[in-house]
Each structure stands twice: as C-alpha cells, then as structure tokens.
Amino acid sequence: MALDAAVKQTIITEYATHEGDTGSPEVQIAMLSQRIKDLTEHLKTHKHDHHSRRGLMLLVGQRRRLLGYLQKVDVNRYRALIERLGLRR
C-alpha cells in the first residue's frame, strides 16, 4: 500500500531538515511509520492477508534499522523524532 502523493508531501514538509529534503532519516522514518500505521489498519480488517503481514514486518525492520542508524549518528535528533512520532523506545 503506497502512500498518497498529498500525504507524502505533508510528511516531507513536516519532517524535512532543509529545503528539498526527502532522504534524511527523519523523513524516511516518518514515511515508514505512516505506511506501518496504514498496513496495521488494513490487517485489522483482513486478518488472513499474510502477504501484507510479511510486508509489514519488512517495513518495521527497515524502520528499526534507520532508527538505530539515527541513534548512532545523532542521539538528540533520534530522541526528538521518536517523541514527535510517538514511538515507544
């Protein structure tokens, strides 16, 4: 389930560190979090959709790796991001 272009743009403007920023860890993690949220809602309705469940697990793993990278590089940015996204860590 891909994100809508409008949703993507709002996430980019909200989490970008500078103008035209689409690849910073903050933006990538925020986009992954939105996709995870959407897939979780989908799986509440379609409990036996195992292909989507596997995709969800891949997204969670990718977000976890990016969070680990951000924590190693800059702890303050990491803490600010998990607080803004409301992630438990």
Curated annotation (Swiss-Prot):
What is any Pfam family matched here?
Ribosomal_S15
Which Gene Ontology terms describe the biological processes this protein takes part in?
Answer: translation
What protein name applies here? Small ribosomal subunit protein uS15
Q: What is its biological role?
A: One of the primary rRNA binding proteins, it binds directly to 16S rRNA where it helps nucleate assembly of the platform of the 30S subunit by binding and bridging several RNA helices of the 16S rRNA.
Q: Which cysteines are joined by disulfide bonds?
A: none
The record's annotation in NCBIfam families points to:
S15_bact (TIGR00952)
GO terms for CC? cytosolic small ribosomal subunit
Q: Which HAMAP family match?
A: Ribosomal_uS15_B (MF_01343_B)
In the record, the note on similarity to other proteins reads: Belongs to the universal ribosomal protein uS15 family.
One GO term in the molecular function aspect is: rRNA binding
Record keywords, A-Z? Ribonucleoprotein, Ribosomal protein, RNA-binding, rRNA-binding
What is the protein's quaternary organization?
Answer: Part of the 30S ribosomal subunit. Forms a bridge to the 50S subunit in the 70S ribosome, contacting the 23S rRNA.
